[in-house]
Amino acid sequence: MFCVIYRSVKRDQTYLYVEKKDDFSRVPEELMKSFGAPQLAMVLPLNGRKKLANADIEKVKLALQEQGFYLQVPPPVESLLTTPV
């Protein structure tokens, strides 16, 4: 199984994984609008791979099979301010 990963031009650290290059037919239109014009980041074989850098590989595979895409968003920003206890 392969996936094609695209970078969002509108949202920093946001990536869209699809099964085939330039095939966004299963991605909701509203998501594509907010994602912006996808920029190809890489083509990645998933078979034999045990993990991905910033996504759970099993969730990615399942999402690709069930809905045809996986959206990776950046982790939430933790507050840099500390409150005294």
From Swiss-Prot:
InterPro entries: YcgL-like_sf, YcgL_dom. Coiled coil: none annotated. PANTHER family: PROTEIN YCGL. Residues 1-85 form the YcgL domain. It holds the Pfam family YcgL. It comes from the Bacteria. The lineage of its organism: Bacteria, Pseudomonadati, Pseudomonadota, Gammaproteobacteria, Enterobacterales. PROSITE patterns: YCGL (PS51648). Transmembrane segments: none annotated. This is YcgL domain-containing protein ECA2367.
